[in-house]
């Protein structure tokens, strides 16, 4: 009997670009090529692609080779299946006039030039913050005039360290492979850990794979590094960490409105606050064209550092000379690292943002006195910790899907319904009727409600529990309702991915109980003794069960000499931190925090187990793709089919 196994890839955006029929066809071509040559390299792709029906009559083998040479110049480089798919999309985007601009820019490397000034600035930042890092001492400082940076990132160690500088504690450094000579498997583990951790702190990496970093692809490496640095520089742009920002609240505004601003917009608001006080009559709305003449910087520096105040800068008419004088003033505050006069004059948005953020860090110019606000700021910013953690988890998960709109604050950004429609279209393609959707900016409230009503309608079609819930509830920003909806959306996405792996079976869909049964059976089969009664089982707090599960699916990934018994709170915390990094290192895209494990957050425990299950079954599916379709029963088929045969049902 012929079996059918759904084809999955780790990147949800990449998965969404293909139908299952297309994926199976391409996977068949990939593995037949691998069987024939022992491995697949870039040089094998042109003849394979030229024979595909899609490119018939559009490109010949030489034309495909020319296109791929631009993106993948090293023709001897071994290609993984996901890179094979990206290469296909690169060629496809050249042949399809209707291909979206997003597709063209995010799946190809055509016409990408490197901004040497940006590279030099990022290198300076890395040299400054990682200079005392033991694992990197022999490589630092990096020379910004060479391509040493792109070589140094290839093993993932530098990027992992940089992520921990941006958001301390994101990666358990015990999980990083740091020996001098890493084998390919260890390098891939580091790169998986890096990219999955980058997603978890808010970076958008839908167009970056481990191989892109392993190859040191310049524009992708610089793009990722900037995102990490930006997160670090904007980390204090919120009322919780800098309560003095409440001083920016205007008479016709409330604190909650200020709290809803994205960090980048809050930085602009801070800048304009000081410019207005200094007598600057214009409004700065961006970090590019509005600061090119250097005038705004001259006013800002005079306001922030009156002891260095001078009118000379404003009297200079030549933009380059004025920019030079601005940076001379900034240097007195130790704030020159990110910018050159040329960057100001040319309006480099990334570097100007970094420069202003640096100014904010060194001297924000805000009063330490308690501002006269009718409500307590502390009261406003201190919310339920679990709610805050869940908002962060869902926000980063939504951003990882590759939707066009970036989410900075779930409770504010989803209220017009548009973002939720974008996310729904990603997880359930074709579910959104875009003809009936209203694109921002939306001034009329009823238009927002229309979007939200469609969100609820689609949710009900996906069998979400939405009793007595209407679009108006979303528009009003009901936090409890929004978290419940997003949880169901995340759960639906994970279960759909798992169900694709059993789409050849006639049985029922995979349930939460099936995931628990699978995990228990995996651990037991590996010879370990831990078992979970449910995803609410308080014994999960010590972390042992999940470490044993990770070891069961990939024995070499857990270093048991680093694992404690999990008896004290400190030991539990160490295990929880290690679990998250090991799972990401394995290839799981997860967004939970150690606290979720320590408190046994049922929702996050389910997602963690499901992510490990997905990775495990996908590896078996990949392995068995080289076997003939006439194979009677694959281990994946058997393992998935047995999910619902365990005695009794578990309370998950």
UniProtKB/Swiss-Prot annotation:
Q: Where is this region: Actin-binding 2?
A: 388-617
Q: What is this protein called?
A: Fimbrin-4
| Source superkingdom | Eukaryota
The record places domain Calponin-homology (CH) at 116-233, 261-364, 388-494, 509-617
UniProt-listed InterPro entries: CH_dom, CH_dom_sf, Fimbrin/Plastin
Supply the alphabetized keyword list: Actin-binding, Cytoplasm, Cytoskeleton, Repeat
Q: Offer one example of a GO biological process linked to this entry.
A: actin filament bundle assembly
Q: Does the keyword Transferase apply?
A: no
- Summarize the protein's role: Cross-links actin filaments (F-actin). Stabilizes and prevents F-actin depolymerization mediated by profilin. May regulate actin cytoarchitecture, cell cycle, cell division, cell elongation and cytoplasmic tractus.
The record ties this protein, via PROSITE patterns, to: CH
Q: Which GO terms describe its molecular function?
A: actin filament binding
Extent of Polar residues compositional bias: 640-652
- SMART domains found in the cross-reference section: CH
Q: Please describe the quaternary structure of this protein.
A: Interacts with F-actin.
Q: Does the entry feature the keyword Repeat, yes or no?
A: yes
**One Pfam family hit:** CH
Task: Outline the segment boundaries, as ranges, of region: Disordered.
Answer: 623-652
User: In terms of one coarse class, where is the protein primarily found?
Assistant: cytoplasm
The listed locations are: Cytoplasm, Cytoskeleton
Gene3D superfamilies, per database record? Calponin-like domain
Q: Where is this region: Actin-binding 1?
A: 116-364
Q: Which organism is it from?
A: Arabidopsis thaliana
Signal sequence coordinates: none
Q: What are its GO cellular component terms?
A: cytoplasm; cytoskeleton
């Amino acid at each position: 009997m012929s079996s059918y196994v759904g084809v999955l890839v780790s990147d949800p955006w990449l998965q969404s670009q293909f139908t299952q029929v297309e994926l199976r066809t391409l996977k068949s071509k990939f593995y037949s090529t691998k069987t024939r040559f022992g491995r697949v390299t870039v040089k094998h792709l042109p003849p394979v692609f030229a024979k595909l029906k899609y490119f018939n009559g559009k490109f010949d083998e030489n034309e495909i080779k020319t296109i791929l040479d631009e993106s993948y110049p090293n023709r001897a480089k071994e290609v993984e299946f996901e890179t094979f798919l990206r290469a296909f999309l690169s060629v496809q985007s050249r042949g399809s006039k209707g291909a979206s601009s997003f597709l063209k820019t995010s799946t190809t490397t055509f016409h990408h030039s490197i901004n040497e000034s940006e590279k030099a600035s990022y290198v300076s930042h890395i040299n400054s913050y990682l200079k005392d890092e033991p694992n990197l001492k022999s490589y630092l400082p990096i020379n910004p005039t060479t391509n040493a940076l792109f070589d140094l990132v290839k093993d993932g160690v530098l990027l992992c360290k940089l992520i921990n500088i941006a958001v301390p504690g994101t990666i358990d450094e015990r999980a990083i492979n740091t020996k001098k000579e890493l084998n390919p498997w260890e390098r891939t583990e580091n790169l998986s850990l890096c990219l999955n951790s980058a997603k978890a702190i808010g970076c958008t990496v839908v167009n970056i794979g481990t191989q892109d970093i392993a190859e040191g692809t310049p524009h992708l490496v610089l793009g990722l590094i900037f995102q990490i640095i930006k997160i670090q520089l904007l980390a204090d742009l919120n009322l919780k960490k800098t309560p003095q920002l409440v001083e920016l609240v205007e008479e016709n505004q409330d604190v909650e409105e200020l709290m809803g601003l994205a960090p980048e917009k809050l930085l602009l608001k801070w800048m304009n606050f000081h410019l207005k006080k200094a007598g600057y009559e214009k409004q700065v709305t961006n970090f590019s064209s509005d600061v090119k003449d250097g005038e705004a910087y001259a006013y800002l520096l005079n306001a922030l550092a009156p002891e260095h105040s001078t009118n000379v800068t404003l009297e200079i008419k030549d933009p380059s000379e004025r920019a030079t004088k601005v940076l001379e003033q900034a240097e007195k505050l130790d704030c020159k690292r990110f910018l050159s006069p040329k960057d100001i004059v040319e309006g480099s948005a990334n570097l100007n943002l970094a420069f202003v953020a640096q100014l904010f860090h060194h001297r924000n110019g805000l009063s330490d006195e308690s501002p006269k606000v009718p409500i307590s700021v502390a009261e406003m910013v201190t919310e339920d910790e679990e709610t805050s953690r869940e908002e962060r988890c869902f926000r980063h998960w939504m951003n990882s899907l590759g939707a066009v709109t970036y989410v900075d604050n779930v409770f504010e950004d989803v209220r017009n319904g548009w973002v939720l429609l974008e996310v729904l279209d990603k997880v359930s393609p074709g579910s959104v009727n875009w003809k009936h959707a209203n694109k921002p900016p939306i001034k009329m409230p009823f238009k927002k409600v229309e979007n939200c009503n469609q969100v609820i309608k689609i949710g009900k079609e996906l069998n979400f529990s939405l009793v007595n819930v209407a679009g108006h509830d979303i528009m009003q920003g009901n936090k409890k309702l929004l978290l419940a909806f997003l949880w169901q959306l995340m759960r639906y996405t994970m279960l759909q991915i798992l169900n694709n792996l059993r789409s050849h079976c006639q049985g029922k869909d995979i349930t939460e109980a099936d995931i628990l049964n699978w995990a228990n059976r995996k651990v037991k089969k590996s010879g370990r003794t831990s078992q979970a009664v449910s995803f609410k089982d308080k014994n999960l707090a010590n972390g042992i069960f999940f470490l044993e599960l990770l070891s069961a699916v990939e024995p070499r990934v857990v270093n048991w000499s680093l694992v404690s018994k999990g008896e004290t709170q400190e030991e539990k915390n160490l295990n929880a931190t290690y679990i998250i990094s090991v799972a990401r290192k394995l290839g799981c895209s997860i967004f939970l925090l150690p606290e979720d494990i320590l408190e046994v957050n049922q929702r996050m425990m389910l997602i963690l187990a499901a992510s490990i299950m997905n990775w495990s079954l996908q590896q078996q599916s990949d392995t068995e793709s080289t076997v003939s379709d006439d194979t009677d029963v694959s281990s994946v088929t058997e393992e998935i089919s047995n999910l619902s045969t365990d005695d009794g049902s578990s309370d998950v």
